[in-house]
């Protein structure tokens, strides 16, 4: 009795055809294999052969898991190592930044009450010098002249070891005139520096300033050439309050009996100050090689700048508006 073979049970086989003209092989009709018990067992259990074949050790290892993670190849271990190194570097950077901010706050606190260094004791000077050295070693911009935009703006002088400024800071000009502010304004686009000393008196304020050009000579050093000096006209103080008494050598002197006389003198002085204030500022040139100097920036960030000048004198400046000005 003939066996009927369903269409989906047929296996098509073709013989290879060679391109050689001498070959005698030709295409033949498909051979239909009848399904018998042996063939059926092969078809049914074919997946068993696949499972056993996957157990064979090849270049990827004993199983597919070894391809991605457990097998040590050129990608696996190094990725983990680089990740650990990156995390450690990031942690060290954060710790260094926090330590720098702490040192800045300590320095600002140490400068308080020193009158820009004039009134600092030897112990305080030594402490400030040590803090400056530590900050210089942590300079976040070791090549500050390659980041000139950080120099832009107005900087307030809060400390110096430059003895040439001490006579000015000691108020030898007049007992009633004091140095109110010393500042430096830098414009890196035009390569200009504007130094200003503002004086204050009971009636008015005035300033002495210099305009200069600077040239970049190295990643840290700039050459400064002063071109012009300016004496600002006095600006009248908005309001003056006469106290009821003053203390002289430990004794209080009552000013009420002569308050009327003082008011009259004040009005006269105010009139003179208004007349002077209407005049233009006095400008004068600064010729010669003596009007040149250089500055070495040893620390720079968005709030704090430390520079060293001729003879090793140090200048500590804080950007206007920074919270470091109010420790």
Swiss-Prot record:
Keywords: Chloroplast, Coiled coil, Plastid, Transit peptide. Residues 56-78 are annotated as: Disordered. The keyword Coiled coil applies. Residues 85-107 form a coiled coil. Expressed in anthers, sepals seeds, fruit coats, and leaves. Very low in petals and pistils and not detected in roots. Disulfide bonds: none annotated. GO terms for cellular component: chloroplast. Residues 1-84 form a transit peptide. It holds the Pfam family PAP_fibrillin. Induction: Down-regulated by drought and oxidative stresses. Up-regulated by wounding. The keyword Plastid applies. It is found in: Plastid, Chloroplast. Belongs to the PAP/fibrillin family. May modulate the action of carotenoids. This is Plastid lipid-associated protein 1, chloroplastic. It comes from Brassica campestris (Field mustard). The gene is PAP1.
């Amino acid at each position: 009795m003939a066996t009927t073979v369903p269409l989906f049970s047929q296996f098509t086989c073709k013989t290879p055809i060679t391109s050689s003209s001498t070959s005698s092989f030709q295409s033949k009709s498909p051979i239909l294999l009848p399904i018998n018990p042996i063939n059926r067992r092969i078809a049914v259990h074919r997946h068993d052969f696949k499972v056993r074949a996957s157990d064979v050790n090849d270049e990827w290892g004993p199983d597919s898991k070894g391809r991605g993670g457990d097998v040590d190849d050129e990608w696996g271990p190094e990725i983990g190592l680089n990740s650990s190194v990156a995390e450690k570097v990031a942690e060290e950077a954060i710790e260094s930044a926090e330590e720098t901010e702490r040192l800045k706050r300590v320095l600002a606190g140490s400068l308080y009450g020193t009158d820009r260094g004039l009134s600092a004791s030897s112990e305080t000077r030594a402490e400030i010098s040590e803090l400056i050295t530590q900050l210089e070693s942590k300079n976040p911009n070791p090549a500050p002249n390659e980041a000139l935009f950080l120099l832009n703006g107005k900087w307030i002088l809060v400390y110096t070891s430059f003895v040439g400024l001490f006579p000015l800071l000691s108020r030898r000009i007049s007992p009633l005139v004091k140095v109110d502010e010393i500042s430096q304004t830098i414009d890196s686009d035009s390569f200009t520096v504007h130094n200003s000393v503002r004086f204050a008196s009971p009636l008015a304020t005035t300033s002495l300033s210099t305009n200069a050009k600077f040239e970049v000579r190295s990643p840290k050093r700039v050459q400064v050439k002063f071109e012009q000096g300016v004496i600002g006209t006095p600006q009248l103080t908005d309001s003056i309050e006469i106290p009821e008494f003053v203390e002289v050598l430990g004794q209080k002197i009552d000013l009420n009996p002569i308050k009327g006389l003082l008011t009259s003198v004040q009005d006269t002085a105010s009139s003179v100050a208004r007349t002077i204030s209407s005049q233009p500022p006095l400008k004068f040139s600064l010729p010669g090689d003596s009007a040149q100097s250089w500055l070495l920036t040893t620390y720079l960030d968005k709030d704090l700048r430390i520079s060293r000048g001729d003879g090793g004198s140090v200048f500590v400046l804080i950007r206007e508006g920074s919270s470091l000005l109010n420790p």
